[in-house]
Amino acid sequence: ISEGLVGSEMCIRDRAWVVLLFAGFNAVSKPWADDDSAVRTFLVHTVKPQHWLIARNLYYVVLLGSVSTVTFAAFLLFLGADHFTEWTVLQYYAGVIFTSTAMASLLATVQAIAARAGGGFSMISVLGLPLIIPIILVSNRYGSDLMRGIAFGDTAHNLLFLATLSAGFSALGYLLFPYLWRD
């Protein structure tokens, strides 16, 4: 692979993460603000907070997973898959899905906390951006390792780290959100 191709791949890969990041923040800033106060009152009295948070988390996983899949398909379409093996494409796609799942679980938890605290998009950004940086850094390292041809066994720990972050954010929201739900 020529050096120019690697540089353009890095630039496009970084742009793909920016698209995913903005899509995630825009997706989580809308739903709660659009809820009517009567709908919120109904939800508070009929739905357990854990169930509501799990539903939001699943919604964001599907939404960001779809955006990630489209972004990854565009990445392959515009860059071509000539230098990828079939196995590398699957490994890279697994990284994209793990990243979108970690982002979705983080943003669902942050959005729920920010909404109950009376904050809007700015609070989501302030709370979420510092926490999302490790996700992007690990994902970027994982993608770079795959592009350089490093064996999957030597870089699979990044996927485990993303899965751990996703589970940790979900568990944190599951445990803490009920205390904010009924005030």
What are the residue ranges of the model-derived segments?
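Transmembrane alpha-helical segments of integral membrane proteins
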Residues: 105-109, 135-148
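Long, hydrophobic alpha-helical segments
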Residues: 13-29
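Selective transmembrane-helix segments that form parts of the transport pathway or gating/packing helices
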Residues: 49-76
